[in-house]
Structure formats: C-alpha cells, structure tokens
Amino acid sequence: MTKLLVGLGNPGDKYFETKHNVGFMLIDQLAKKQNVTFTHDKIFQADLASFFLNGEKIYLVKPTTFMNESGKAVHALLTYYGLDIDDLLIIYDDLDMEVGKIRLRAKGSAGGHNGIKSIIQHIGTQVFNRVKIGIGRPKNGMSVVHHVLSKFDRDDYIGILQSIDKVDDSVNYYLQEKNFEKTMQRYNG
C-alpha cells in the first residue's frame, strides 16, 4: 500500500513559516524525522519525499502550485499511483480554530479554505481524511489575506510548534494503526 501525506502551503522563501504554511511545516518535520529530502517533480507540480513504514510506502507532498491550485497536484498523484481517497491525508491551516488547536476529520466542506476547495473540485469529493491546525482569526481589523500570509508572533509560534508535534504524533499513530476513525477518537479532544 501507499499513502499520500499532503501539507498545504505556498512555495518559496517569502511564505516560509507563514500561518498559511503550517501544512508545509508539518510535512517538513516528518521528512526531517525520517531523514528524507524533497525533490521537485514538475509533472506532479509538487516537492516529494518518500520512505517506507511497516512495508508501506509513504509519500510526503508539498504542492508547488500555490495554495489555490493544490488540487492539481493531489489529483495527479492519486491518478498516477492509482490510489484510493482513503490513501490520502491532507494537513492544513484553519482560521476558525484558535491557534494551535487541532482537529481531525474524515469529510467536510472547504469552509472557505481555497486549497481545500481546489482539492474537492479536482478529486470530486469532500470525503477525505484531513488534519486542521488552528491559526486563529485576524485581529485589529487585519484582512484575512494579510493574516494568513503573515508569520506567527512569538507566543503563537511556540503554540504552533507544540501543535505540530501533536499532529506529528497523530499522523504516526494513523500510519501505524491504519485506521483514521480510531486516530480521530484518540486525538480529537
């Protein structure tokens, strides 16, 4: 079996560790722990790394299409490898959750998230496993765009790093147990 772990974000140094890139941050942490490096694949429009865990090939994916076109890379990879939707796990930021809170879901709407909207449009379903990481709402009249493309303040950054560790644990648990329902029960709280 093969699994695709896809972190959403925007490519380039300009967006490094911005709120919208928490999905990339988690995928980078998984790659570091597995001691694997990314290579860019022009056909899939993504940076890819892979490793084996319990005989299963795991792909770490960072789409390079920019957030709003993430579905292109996800669809291309699912199609090429002949994978089911159950083999997909998307990790991304959520404005409507407080900073650092995580929520695992097996289905749902885009909730205003353009990366998720693109994935739903390209794969044709809202039913796929996902992990949302809270980045909070904009404060003091800041626009949503400015908020998601800004970096975390010091306190929020510490909280995000802790939540990324928790998501890392949940992803590893999911890969070991091969059961997303059980993973949701354990990590949603």
From Swiss-Prot:
The active site is at H20 (proton acceptor). The keyword Cytoplasm applies. It comes from the Bacteria. PROSITE patterns: PEPT_TRNA_HYDROL_1, PEPT_TRNA_HYDROL_2. One of its GO terms (biological process) is rescue of stalled ribosome. Its main location: cytoplasm. Its EC number is 3.1.1.29. TRNA binds at Y15, F66, N68, N114. Transmembrane segments: none annotated. The keyword tRNA-binding applies. The record marks D93 as: Stabilizes the basic form of H active site to accept a proton. InterPro entries: Pept_tRNA_hydro (IPR001328), Pept_tRNA_hydro_CS (IPR018171), Pept_tRNA_hydro_sf (IPR036416). Keywords: Cytoplasm, Hydrolase, RNA-binding, tRNA-binding. One of its GO terms (molecular function) is peptidyl-tRNA hydrolase activity. Gene3D superfamilies: Peptidyl-tRNA hydrolase (3.40.50.1470). The record marks N10 as: Discriminates between blocked and unblocked aminoacyl-tRNA. It is found in: Cytoplasm. Belongs to the PTH family. Monomer. This is Peptidyl-tRNA hydrolase. It comes from Streptococcus pneumoniae (strain ATCC 700669 / Spain 23F-1).
